[in-house]
Amino acid sequence: FQKGALMEQFGLRTRIIMGDGLDSLTAGMKKAFVVTDSFMAQSGKVSYVTDKLNRAGVEWQVFSDIAGEPDIGMVTAGTAKITEFDPDTVICLGGGAAIDAAKAIVFIAKKTGNANKNIEFVAIPTTSGTGSEVSRFAVITDKTKGIKYPLIDDSLLPDVAVLDAQLVMSAPPSVTADTGIDVFTHAVEAFVSTGRNDFSDACAEKAIKLVNHYLMAAYKNPNDAK
């Protein structure tokens, strides 16, 4: 959302696919760089992506050196890997931290001329709450200085977000609770923002109602698709 002196604009640049829609994106894909966190890789959950890539005959490489909040070291390592692999697509599977890391990796690789400028960026969130898959923000930490650096740029936006409820249902109850409250917090923040408008109000109100009606049920029964 952008607000100027004489006009307001509301837009969502990221294309959203709801459901198990990654297969529809593999046509024409040749090399995919998969960014995920260490848990997703070690638990085998990254197969949600790699199995589909194998079926489509796509060459792939996984970068999973992400644990906790993304820091400069993780992003630097990821940038080196993506430069070496030279993919046409980046696919991120994970929560807000993994998506932020992938955003920074793609952003820096492009800015330094070490990645294809036309690389497609696909984000597949495994939690609700941050909305990182459709935002122009990323936060990277410098652990040595104890400083968090915000990155803000339209080029950080993923080209496509795949929202598959099955991935969220696999989260443990504690994560469902934490990210559910995160959804509520972001919705309230949007509703009281000085940059709010009728479109954002409608989205915020709907999110607040959904959290109120369904968060406790999702916490108690993660397999309840409703």
Model-derived segments and spans:
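Active-site segments that bind and position negatively charged phosphate/pyrophosphate groups
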Residues: 194-226
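Conserved beta-strand elements of the Class I
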Residues: 32-34, 89-91, 122
